[in-house]
């Protein structure tokens, strides 16, 4: 800042300061956005650069301006030269304001000349409005003699109020002024000594007392702290130096006394603070000390932020008490200590868990939910009906503890997507917990914090990720859990799925109870057998059977093909798969209960089409780019006046139209064999494999749905032993022994030996084999199939190739019911088998089989083994005696 008096022109452009005062020597930064202010800055400061000088006048306004701006939204009239004379302590704006309907502006009669220390110009987007950021320094006081409008801003005729250089030199020798100066400096120094421990900028203010001339000192010092607008105006009006120093001393002393009184009150209140409040204040002071030392400031800020986050987490009172104890322990530790990171991670988990946060459920519309289920899942009528019933109960009683639904069925039938549909209908977040291969109880309950690398269980971690306490949680592949020395995860799930216990689920890592009662649990499994009975008892089993070929066809046309095309960047304009070709893919290339293999085959067709489409797209892009590039080169060179050393020859046809609309690729049988290879399955498989005696066709149920199981029997020279192969379980081995015993006992009745005294196994062994030896097999439903194979072997008669069977047998020849009837019938239909022998007591299960399948097959119901044999052989099985044991 310059200490020499400023040469003040007779007229100054005036910038209004609403409810603010700029004092000589003070520096202020403002942002000009109003058109009139922008015009003033541009003409008086930006264009004149260092020579620019403006006047700053305080403006009285009934409404204070916003913190971010010191400018008036409008100053004066845009036309005319109407002037205003000085009247009292303020100058009123010209009468044009009243005529234009604007509220009169009350200008102060005294102002300060100012110069720009820094100017920056900007343009707001997208409006394009020009703005200026100006740093102004106050120079000297002036009084307004006349105020007139010049275009958008005002110009004032001014007269200087500050002393000349000669007057200043004489005033500095005045004893009264010297005494006032000393008194002011003493009061200011006392204020600085009080503030120097609280404000870092006090040191710079202290230097001003020794370096700034006395006639500037009062203005600069008073401008450095907050005072009211009226007090600022009184300082501006204090033209005489003695009056100014007296006024400044009074303001500084008043500010000092207010600080001392506030400190006294603070000290008095601190004596009455509680222990926790004192601890908080001490920690604040400790943080300030560490900031000065540059030690652990970031860590301390992080810990404070973590504590605030914990306070906002909504923990129950007992858990909050536990968290506070952990927080106190963390504060006593240094970040370098071994347990610091684990303690910090634990507290972050407590802060992140959704103790009270829930996702709001919208009003359930069962019609919309049903339409959504029908749109996302084809078929599965009974399953979708059960889900609608579940949602109806939730609608009538939202806080009801519904059952834990467990969808059991082969892969690819939509178990996971059904759980997602429930979450969608309830407007809840969805989280999937995969339990396949989990053998450690700690995966469910978490590891204790004493272990290195410990972490919470999958349930708590999932809740942390979704950040709500009431999601729909899918326990996927719940039948794939195992057990070892580390515990049994299925046992840990007992507490999770029990509504009486999961209100206070105790994760080992969390070590405090967490309420899981708001979570809607849904489980999926391929088989029920591996699930422990206590866990199975806590769930409602909903079986999802495999799809029929007709259902697969509908699913492929409605869901799979659009999804596959989208995943490969194709559309129906690139690739079309007719319905007949999809049917061939189902019949010849897939034999599964679900549709995953079908989707893989469709994806293979899409990839083959994508290769050709990509080649066409490459050619198309080159054709489109030739013309624009050529034109641009010509235009640019001609514009520069240069000569073009090339000749443009018109093309006979437009390259861009050559591949504009390529014809779609339509899948046919030739493409199927080229892409997918020769057919993997055909209807002749059963006939080819049952072409010799000793082979029968059975039906079994596996984790992937129903399957056709061939049984082969042969005899050889031996000692009457029975050999079984095919990776068989104990139950199926017993069924084979039972079947052989029954056949030997009924050998004479079945015309397998002349009399009942002859031993069928004399001097020969029997070997029974179940093909697909790598697949484990067990269960009692192969009993009737084993008997049929043995009778075929001993009688040297072939079993009908179009007949398959299933059923458990007893030693007395009764046929008992079995499970999985629908899946077994569907498997037979997939293989092209038209006749199925079932136990009579399984008649009720046929209602689940789709009518188109039943109408295409012959279902034979039997009570005894003899009936099975009658249906299994051409012309019935000749029995010597029809008596039943």
Curated annotation (Swiss-Prot):
ATP binds at residues 409-416. Keywords: ATP-binding, Hydrolase, Nucleotide-binding, Peroxisome, Protease, Serine protease. Residues 94-104 have a biased composition (Basic and acidic residues). Residues 70-104 are annotated as: Disordered. One of its GO terms (biological process) is protein import into peroxisome matrix. It is an enzyme of class 3 (hydrolase). Its main location: other. The active site is at residues 781, 824. It catalyses: Hydrolysis of proteins in presence of ATP. Disulfide bonds: none annotated. It is found in: Peroxisome matrix. Residues 77-86 have a biased composition (Gly residues). Its EC number is 3.4.21.53. ATP-dependent serine protease that mediates the selective degradation of misfolded and unassembled polypeptides in the peroxisomal matrix. Necessary for type 2 peroxisome targeting signal (PTS2)-containing protein processing and facilitates peroxisome matrix protein import. Belongs to the peptidase S16 family. HAMAP family: lonp2_euk (MF_03121). This is Lon protease homolog 2, peroxisomal. It comes from Zea mays (Maize). The lineage of its organism: Eukaryota, Viridiplantae, Streptophyta, Embryophyta, Tracheophyta.
